[in-house]
UniProtKB/Swiss-Prot annotation:
Family (UniProt): Belongs to the pescadillo family.
SMART domains: BRCT
Native species: Leishmania infantum
Function noted in UniProt: Required for maturation of ribosomal RNAs and formation of the large ribosomal subunit.
Lineage per the UniProt record: Eukaryota, Discoba, Euglenozoa, Kinetoplastea, Metakinetoplastina
Protein name: Pescadillo homolog
Predominant localisation class: nucleus
Length: 671
């Protein structure tokens, strides 16, 4: 029995936990709404369930979702929650009017003046106190909006306070309008830096207010939305993103118009271009350094300045890429996607096929379309040429891109530095830091483009051996390549065995597919963790800090490491891992040999036992203790048979021996 103080402490902890967290069911009861409405409200307000640590999971339960009580209490007086309750009351009035046949009252209730509507203006101001915070969420917003912009609506409705399970006509029109405004801004401001064509669609990257924004535009084709998807969740995100992008685009367009007006005024007055369409100084990305600022702040400002200068160089190379060129896009090519790249790089898109006004024709056919004549002064290229020029920031030779020619590989600029410039290398390093599993392999096509940009360029690793080693054995996952041997499985090797393990055989060895078993203690720990649902529990804070410090130390050592030292380190790691693999193979072979010996010895011992049994039976037959039955197929114990006959003569029954219990070796609960 627990002490009074211990019981009181447990009670206080439990009450404190109840005050701090609420379950989803408690939150819906507090707000007096259904779970669907509660989930939609949380999406709009940016409230998500909290991950609890192990001690709190034990006293609360594993299958429940918990929210901070203070965040749920904020929703009690929220205007969106009040509008949802008002809409529920309005629905009851409409049903009553329909049931009673009051057409005039029904007409008044369904008018836009009476029907409740909610506004997300205050919510957007709460979630994004600074404009740069909203810019950082534009990538997810534009990917979602572009997805629904080409989907056909299924419900005719202009309001979003209802819970729709399919795309409405009002949201579809707003999504198309936002996409057009965003493409227009990117083309006017000329902030597009990269592009890539993939199976999923068209990837773009733009630098807006000092932030890299990447979004995905899907391929437009006949579609059918798959069943079984809760669309109201995605539509809730879409509703919020549409409202957010209105504010973002208004701010960007007004800043762009102001900068263009200032630039024109400066050109008219002084004849010198002072401002560009995109001014990073007005982006609010940098802070002014005071005179008494410490060294850490100075270092941060210096890093931000270098980042800003690299982005400025990147944009300067792209903005005048297609200057003076006019492209005609054939009808089989999606004109929106390629017109965005051409306009953002300073080129023009022709609407009519007039050879005197055109320099390039973009065709995605093995031959020219019917009715179009070929002219020698024009270049007829395939669509990939536009994106490859954008990524290389250079007008590439059209050889290999003409109609009917086999295209070169289309390399993603997000994982490989195509130009090998400082700004591209910095961007790729940041991507690798955010996504550690990206392999830094440089294809041969990238070396060709780098040679075109800089004739003095020479590839350090043209065959990609170092990149192959990095992809196969990374520093963070080197322990996964070879399973660690436990103490009970480890066996000391002699000198001859080590020499045999190091010797490279002339034949190809059979791969060891045997699974290495966990030790009993480790297996028991894993079992207990699974029972307590702690396999995916959050990492301890001390352990997380230690891992973060180790990771930072590894990154620092990598930055100061030369390419030769890196190659030597990778080769030594490979040799060490090969030795460990050979050691493991030898240990597995030893275990296989032990099992084979055990099997052979069992067969030999069984044969010996059988021979001894037969010899004993022959001896007993010779002594008369056993004799054959009448049919000659069995043996009978002479003494036992005599006792049975005497008992039968006295009309008694001989007590038979109990049969052996086959479950004798099993535990009692099985019997």
């Amino acid at each position: 029995m627990a002490h009074k103080k211990q019981a009181w402490a447990k009670r206080v902890k439990k009450e404190r936990f109840k005050k701090k967290f609420l379950t989803r069911m408690q939150a819906t009861r507090l707000l007096q709404m259904e779970s669907v409405q509660f989930r939609r409200l949380c999406i709009l307000k940016g409230i998500y369930p909290r991950a609890l640590n192990r001690s709190k999971q034990k006293q609360s339960g594993h299958e429940k979702q918990y929210y901070l009580a203070r965040e749920i209490k904020w929703l009690v007086r929220d205007q969106i929650a009040e509008k949802m309750m008002a809409y529920r009351a309005w629905e009851k009035k409409v049903k009553r009017a329909e049931a009673m046949g009051r057409s005039e009252d029904l007409k008044v209730l369904q008018s836009s003046r009476v029907k409740p509507r909610h506004s997300l203006v205050a919510t957007i101001k709460e979630r994004y106190p600074y404009f740069i915070d909203a810019i950082r969420d534009v990538d997810d917003a534009m990917s979602m909006i572009h997805l629904y912009a080409f989907l056909s609506p299924e419900i005719k409705s202009d309001t979003t306070i209802e819970i729709h399970h399919s795309l409405t006509s009002g949201m579809s029109e707003k999504a198309k309008e936002v996409c057009e405004r965003w493409d227009r801004y990117v083309a006017r401001a000329r902030v597009l830096t990269k592009g890539f064509i993939s199976i999923k669609g068209y990837y773009y990257e733009a630098i807006v207010k000092g932030e890299r924004v990447r979004w995905l535009c899907p391929h437009e084709y006949a579609h059918r939305f798959p069943p079984g998807i809760q669309q109201y969740v995605m539509l809730s995100f879409l509703e919020f993103y549409l409202e957010m992008m209105k504010f973002v685009l208004f701010k960007l367009e007004s800043d762009l118009a102001r900068d263009e007006a200032d630039r024109l005024a400066a050109e008219d007055e002084e004849g010198v271009t002072r401002a560009n369409a995109e001014d990073f100084a007005n982006g609010g990305a940098l802070a002014v350094l005071d005179v008494g600022a410490n060294g850490a702040q100075a270092k941060e400002v210096k890093e931000a300045e270098s980042k800003r200068s690299l982005m400025g160089e990147e944009l300067h190379k792209v903005r005048e890429l297609f200057r003076g060129l006019t492209f005609f896009i054939s009808r089989e090519v999606p004109s929106k996607r390629f017109a965005l790249v051409i306009n953002a790089c300073g080129g023009r898109v022709a609407t009519d096929y007039v050879p005197s006004n055109i320099t390039h024709v973009v065709v995605d056919r093995p031959a020219l379309p019917p009715g179009m004549k070929k002219h020698d002064q024009l270049e007829y290229v395939q669509p990939q040429y536009i994106f490859d020029c954008l990524n290389a920031r250079l007008m590439l030779p059209v050889t290999g891109y003409r109609i009917g020619e086999e295209l070169p590989p289309h390399v993603s600029p997000f994982s490989v530095s195509i130009t090998n410039s400082a700004e591209d290398n910095a961007a790729v390093e940041q991507v690798k830091k955010d996504h550690p599993r990206i392999v830094g392999y440089v294809p041969a096509r990238v070396h060709e483009i780098r040679k075109l940009i800089n004739p003095s360029y020479s590839a350090v690793d043209p065959e990609g051996k170092v990149a192959h080693l990095e992809g196969e054995y990374s520093d963070e996952e080197s322990h996964v390549a070879v399973p660690e041997m436990d103490m009970e499985d480890d066996v000391s090797l002699s000198g001859d065995e080590l020499a045999e393990a190091r010797r490279k055989p002339a034949w190809q060895e059979e791969e060891v597919t045997e699974e290495v078993q966990r030790p009993k203690l480790s297996a028991f720990k894993v079992k207990k963790q699974r029972e307590m649902n702690l396999m995916n529990a959050p990492t301890n804070e001390v352990v997380a800090r230690r891992r973060q410090a180790l990771r930072k130390a590894q990154e620092k050592s990598r930055q100061t490491e030369t390419s030769e030292a890196r190659l030597q380190r990778k080769m030594s790691e490979v040799k060490r891992q090969e030795a460990a693999t050979r050691k493991m193979q030898l240990q597995v072979a030893r275990k296989k040999a032990a099992r084979f010996y055990k099997m052979i010895s069992g067969v030999v011992q069984g044969t010996a036992k059988k021979a001894a049994t037969l010899e004993a039976k022959a001896k007993h037959i010779a002594e008369g203790k056993l004799h054959k039955t009448e049919d000659g197929k069995g043996l009978v114990n002479t003494r036992l048979e005599a006792r049975r006959q005497r008992a039968e003569a006295k009309s008694k029954k001989l007590k038979e021996r109990k049969a052996g219990n086959p479950y004798k070796k099993l535990p009692k609960w099985v019997q």
